């Protein structure tokens, strides 16, 4: 699981999901990537599920890069708790993803294998995404 080693504060405000991604919109490491088309909070468990889906499909060939990190805690009150009583306890860690952000990259495999591996990873993510190639266009 991806979580920060330590944070300055235990609880944070919920991040906004408005606007396009300001950085991380291009492929830096691999040949193919997953790009977000809608805003979402991606949890550490969803990132791990997508990573496992990709690596199981490509088996021993290729390399996977994760370019997002869940650095924000999301808090929740327990079920059945009444209103008030302060902010809830941190439940899980999220990465705030804006449209246009590249989240996963893959390299060292053929285009067909990369497309299928990334499609399986997209099924694990909570927002609409697309597969892009290093040349700049859709696959």
Curated annotation (Swiss-Prot):
Q: Which GO terms describe its cellular component?
A: cytosolic large ribosomal subunit
UniProt region (Disordered), positions on chain: 1-23
Q: Which branch of life, at top level?
A: Bacteria
Annotated InterPro entries? Ribosomal_uL16, Ribosomal_uL16_bact-type, Ribosomal_uL16_CS, Ribosomal_uL16_dom, Ribosomal_uL16_sf
Tell me one Pfam family matched here.
Ribosomal_L16
Give this protein's Gene Ontology molecular function annotations. Answer: rRNA binding; structural constituent of ribosome; tRNA binding
UniProt biased composition (Basic residues)? 1-16
Keyword terms:
Ribonucleoprotein, Ribosomal protein, RNA-binding, rRNA-binding, tRNA-binding
Q: Which residues cross the membrane?
A: none
Annotated NCBIfam families: rplP_bact (TIGR01164)
Q: Which PANTHER family match?
A: 50S/60S RIBOSOMAL PROTEIN L16 (PTHR12220), LARGE RIBOSOMAL SUBUNIT PROTEIN UL16M (PTHR12220:SF13)
Q: How does it assemble?
A: Part of the 50S ribosomal subunit.
Q: What does this protein do?
A: Binds 23S rRNA and is also seen to make contacts with the A and possibly P site tRNAs.
Hey, which family's this protein in? Answer: Belongs to the universal ribosomal protein uL16 family.
Tell me the protein's name.
Answer: Large ribosomal subunit protein uL16
Q: Which organism is it from?
A: Bifidobacterium animalis subsp. lactis (strain AD011)
Kindly list the organism's lineage.
Bacteria, Bacillati, Actinomycetota, Actinomycetes, Bifidobacteriales
Give me the gene this protein comes from. rplP
